[in-house]
Design a protein with these regions (language model features):
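Extracellular/virion structural assembly segments
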Residues: 2-184
Length: 184
């Protein structure tokens, strides 16, 4: 059985208006050099945004609401928070690095990950939950430092906006079709 991972794929808008993949998809935990990024949580992945396209009217002469429900109703965007721990060495091995060098390596790995996330749409794919979602970074982030058994690491949380206001089954092509059609 293949090892399960968390993947992210960066998309940039072309001059023609389509969203194109910027390179290959990356493993969140394996592809950001300098240190080791470890997934902690993604809060809000399964949240569903308020349904748009539903309208009600109330009249004094009626006991019931007049209701309109668009058959193509969509969800408002939702918020999610991706939290990762970034270590300054390969956590699967041993380290001979000084504390200062470990912190520098952790900062390098964090900078690499954050540069990949910002200024683009990010397709998240989660092997564990078999879910995918389309995110963008909209808020500032401030990593904090901490120690586990005298090993320094960065705790980094990134606030994301879920473009569709929901996640999709891993086999769905809804997001990819939307990206190819320029966000339509």
């Amino acid at each position: 059985m293949a090892e399960k991972k968390f993947y992210i794929q960066r998309y940039l808008k072309s001059e023609q208006g389509a969203w194109n993949a910027d390179g290959l998809r990356k493993s969140l935990e394996d592809d950001f050099g300098g240190g080791s990024v470890r997934y902690k949580s993604l809060e809000g992945l399964n949240s569903k945004g308020k349904q748009k396209g539903v309208y009600t009217e109330s009249y004094p002469e009626s006991d019931a609401l007049r209701v309109f429900v668009d058959t193509n109703a969509r969800n408002e965007s939702t918020n999610a928070t991706l939290s990762v721990c970034v270590f300054g060495y390969d956590v699967d091995g041993t380290t001979e690095l000084s504390i200062t060098d470990q912190i520098k390596a952790a900062e390098k790995a964090w900078d690499s990950l954050y540069a990949y996330l910002e200024c683009a749409l990010i397709l998240w794919y989660d092997d564990y939950r078999q879910r995918k979602a389309l995110f963008l970074v909209q808020d500032a982030t401030e990593p904090s430092t901490d120690n586990i058994k005298n090993i320094p690491y960065l705790l980094c949380s990134v606030k994301l906006v879920n473009v569709f206001g929901q996640s999709f089954d891993g086999d769905s092509t809804t997001i990819e079709d939307w990206l190819k059609n320029g966000g339509k």
